[in-house]
């Protein structure tokens, strides 16, 4: 068997398995998953949702070919103090969110946990304001409590 770099004998399974395991580390997705690199850089630290305080309201310009100012807020997370930008979904949502309000944010649902649509660098969206669903406030079913 000249030229073969792999063991080809009858009892070579263990050796072949070890060799495969060694080569898996060149696969970027495998390496990121095993070393939990996503969790280490994620401001939410792997959690599906997080609470935070609104620091400021910001308008973010959408990417080409669209032209709009998307209403967002800068949120400081309570668990670690990191500041992230979160999108305010819904018509007139900015009117119901003020600075120093407590909000709950979650992922915006972009590909591979990244930004969504024409919003550059925005990975999260606001779902609750002062403990009440933003969707219910916008529909007029519930009122935003004053803190």
Curated annotation (Swiss-Prot):
- A biological process term (GO) from this entry: translation
- One Gene Ontology cellular component: small ribosomal subunit
- Give the domain of life: Archaea
Q: Which Pfam families does the entry mention?
A: Ribosom_S12_S23 (PF00164)
User: Which GO-annotated molecular functions does the record name?
Assistant: rRNA binding; structural constituent of ribosome
Keywords associated with the record: Ribonucleoprotein, Ribosomal protein, RNA-binding, rRNA-binding
- Record function comment: With S4 and S5 plays an important role in translational accuracy. Located at the interface of the 30S and 50S subunits.
Q: What family does the entry list?
A: Belongs to the universal ribosomal protein uS12 family.
Q: Which HAMAP family match?
A: Ribosomal_uS12_A
Subunit text: Part of the 30S ribosomal subunit.
The name this protein goes by in its record: Small ribosomal subunit protein uS12
Q: What organism is the protein native to?
A: Thermofilum pendens (strain DSM 2475 / Hrk 5)
Q: Which gene produces this protein?
A: rps12
């Amino acid at each position: 068997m000249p030229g073969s770099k792999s063991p080809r004998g009858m009892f070579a399974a263990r050796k072949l398995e070890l060799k495969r395991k060694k080569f898996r580390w060149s696969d970027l997705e495998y390496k990121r998953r095993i070393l939990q690199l996503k969790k280490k850089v994620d401001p939410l630290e792997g959690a599906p949702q997080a609470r935070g305080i609104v620091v400021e309201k910001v308008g973010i310009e959408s990417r080409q070919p669209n032209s709009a100012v998307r209403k967002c807020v800068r949120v400081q997370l309570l668990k670690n103090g990191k500041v992230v930008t979160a999108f305010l979904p819904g018509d007139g949502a900015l009117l119901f969110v003020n600075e120093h309000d407590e909000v709950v944010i979650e992922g915006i649902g972009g590909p591979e946990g990244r930004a969504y649509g024409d919003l550059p660098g925005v990975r999260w969206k606001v779902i609750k304001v002062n403990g009440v669903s933003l969707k219910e406030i916008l529909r007029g079913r519930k009122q935003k409590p004053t803190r």
